[in-house]
Amino acid sequence: MATKTHKSSARRTNKTGIPVRSIPPPPADASAATPQSDAHAPVIERAFGLGPGGLPSEREPHSVERLDGLHSLAGGILESLAPRVIRDLNHELRDRLDKAPLELNSYGYDPWGLNCDVARRTLLVFALFYKYYFRVKAYGLENLPKGRMLIIGNHAGQIAIDASMIGMATVLEADPPRFLRGMGEYWLPTLPFFNVFMARVGGVVGTPKNCVDILHHEEAVIAFPEGVRGMNKPFSERYQLQEFGNGFMRLALQTNTPIVPVAVVGSEEQAISIGNFMPLARLFSMPAFPILLNYFPLPTRYHIYFGEPMEFRGNPNDEDEVIVKKVEQVKGRIHDMIQRGLRQRRSIFF
């Protein structure tokens, strides 16, 4: 009976719902095997949490999804071959994430599937862009409150790089570091493999329930009320704020969460859009498929401004007319910050 159980590799889940492979019994001659520490185990075995002979190690018996293992393997190889500047940045990210207020279980996951090891290797790419490609300048990080907050910003650039750069600013430069939870579009998890990856790096589908749960855990949520309207607008409408949705304000009122307005200057010029190819967008169930003059972003210089927190009181179930007045206050603050940033910058690229 035990042999049948081992052969079928029955899967189980822990309290967070993360699948965990069951651990097979050791071989008969396991007692005679020579011990081998995880530190000297082959990189493939370490990546999948395996000990000598391909068995799950005692230190990490919870071997997770193969995607996580492949990500760890690739990250380990790249880290060993990387120049010193990348290795140093990787260590900096590890230290900063260790200091960030995150609620992780004993397996290293939070309730929404975030894994800091996977996230760190992904953030490393964005950190390189942050420091050396977009050369981001962040202002007003001292305005970030402790505990829960809603970061609300303008959205642009055809590709959601602006969200990544805002997130890198709060991880690399805020004191203490803050890991922002991105509220993704509903269609994103429908992309093959992306749903698991999105969860591992901290992304969450932007449902009201997900947002409320995260805020109740005193975490920081970033949202863009313009949505696709802002991100995919033509170049001729750059830095013109589009209509804001009202959902973020209702969430702020429901959870008594301060709103931090954020203005990004530099994102509008990174990709030049001349239109949308909607037939292809519909084919992939995407809200838009922009036609760009450049599909790799230009090295524009990012300026990110964090404003003072805005607090609102009221009934989250009020009529739209009441909520819109509060939304317009946030939109107006962001508009003023954008205009001030445009006046202050000397060049698009420097």
Describe every region a protein language model picked out:
Residues 15-20, 41, 295, 307:
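Low-complexity, intrinsically disordered short peptide segments enriched in small/polar/basic residues
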Residues 4, 131-320:
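Soluble catalytic domains of membrane acyltransferases
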Residues 25-169, 174-180, 184-209, 339-350:
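Membrane-anchoring hydrophobic helices of lipid-metabolizing enzymes
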Residues 1-36:
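N-terminal acidic, proline/glycine-rich, low-complexity intrinsically disordered segments
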Residues 297-350:
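C-terminal terminal-subdomain/extension
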Residues 19, 76, 280-283:
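Residue-level detector of alpha-helical transmembrane segments in integral membrane proteins
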